[in-house]
């Protein structure tokens, strides 16, 4: 009976703690939908999360900040999960690359995971020394594995112990191979994501993503096309915008970072030109529909 009473008291205390005004030391279990009273907090520091937006007909309006401009529904808005334990608040996004951020609930720091995700270095630096070191570790690991295999019958260990040893070795090999791959240069045949495509790919991208900044050389407000010499010189303006390009096997994609992030997917072998800038300018948002 005492145990039951004790459990009831604990449940009541938990309910009281969860109802405390935010921020506080109360716990918030991992959830996709934080309490309504906490939305302003979360949407200030995790502004890309889906629970901060109302989307309709492909156009999204911020739930908390009325003055926030309308945006087009795209990859900028991600499914998020948030939690709070003690004085630590955290959120992570279910994007292609998961982003996890922990911050102090009382002194939080803004973290724009989307900008970091899109900021890929123009030129990847190949860490030759790291690759050499990793290769030596791989050779040593393989030699150790061969030695263990030869001594397998002499080992006086249980089958489960042997299995764990081999699993550990294979895991180590996997980590070493991943380290090598991450330090290798990007190949034009491999999946990539970058702000500046390789020079040999410029003609392709500048044919179909002709408004992207990597296609132009600008000086004193005048811009000249890098690829097509017969293209007339144009004035530097909103026509030229920052872009991110990516290729995943047979699918090519570029995203223009305009006021509204605009994304276009196409077949790499049979691409289709899209005048995204003209379409974007013609895009009329009826706020009454939101």
From Swiss-Prot:
One of its GO terms (cellular component) is membrane. It is found in: Host membrane. The keyword Secreted does not apply. Keywords: Glycoprotein, Host membrane, Membrane, Transmembrane, Transmembrane helix. The keyword Translocase does not apply. Pfam families: v110. InterPro entries: ASFV_fam_110. It comes from the Viruses. It is a multi-pass membrane protein. The chain crosses the membrane at residues 1-19, 128-148, 163-183. Glycans are attached at residues 242, 267. Plays a role in virus cell tropism, and may be required for efficient virus replication in macrophages. Belongs to the asfivirus MGF 110 family. This is Protein MGF 110-9L. It comes from African swine fever virus (isolate Pig/Kenya/KEN-50/1950) (ASFV).
């Amino acid at each position: 009976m005492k145990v039951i009473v004790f459990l009831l008291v604990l449940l009541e205390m938990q309910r009281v703690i969860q109802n405390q005004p935010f921020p506080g030391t109360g716990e918030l279990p991992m959830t996709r939908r934080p309490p309504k009273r906490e939305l302003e907090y979360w949407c200030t520091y995790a502004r890309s999360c889906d629970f901060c937006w109302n989307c309709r007909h492909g156009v999204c309006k911020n739930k908390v900040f009325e003055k926030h401009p309308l945006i087009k529904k795209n990859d900028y808005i991600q499914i998020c999960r948030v939690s709070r334990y003690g004085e630590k608040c955290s959120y992570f996004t279910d994007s292609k690359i998961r982003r996890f951020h922990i911050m102090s609930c009382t002194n939080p720091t803004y973290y724009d995971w989307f900008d970091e995700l899109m900021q890929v270095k123009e030129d990847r630096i190949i860490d030759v020394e790291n690759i050499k070191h990793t290769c030596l570790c791989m050779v040593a690991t393989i030699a150790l594995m061969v030695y263990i295999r030869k001594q397998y019958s002499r080992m006086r260990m249980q089958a489960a112990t042997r299995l764990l040893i081999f699993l550990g070795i294979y895991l180590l090999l996997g980590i070493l191979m991943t380290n090598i791959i991450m330090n290798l240069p990007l190949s034009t045949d491999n999946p990539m994501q970058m702000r500046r495509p390789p020079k040999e790919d410029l003609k392709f991208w500048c044919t179909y993503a002709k408004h992207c900044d990597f296609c132009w050389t600008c000086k004193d407000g005048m811009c000249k096309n890098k690829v097509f010499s017969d293209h007339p010189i144009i004035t530097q303006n909103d026509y030229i915008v920052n872009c991110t390009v990516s290729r995943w096997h047979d699918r090519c994609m570029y995203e223009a970072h305009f006021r509204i992030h605009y994304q276009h997917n196409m077949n790499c072998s049979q691409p289709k030109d899209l005048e995204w800038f003209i379409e974007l300018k013609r895009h009329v948002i009826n706020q009454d529909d939101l």
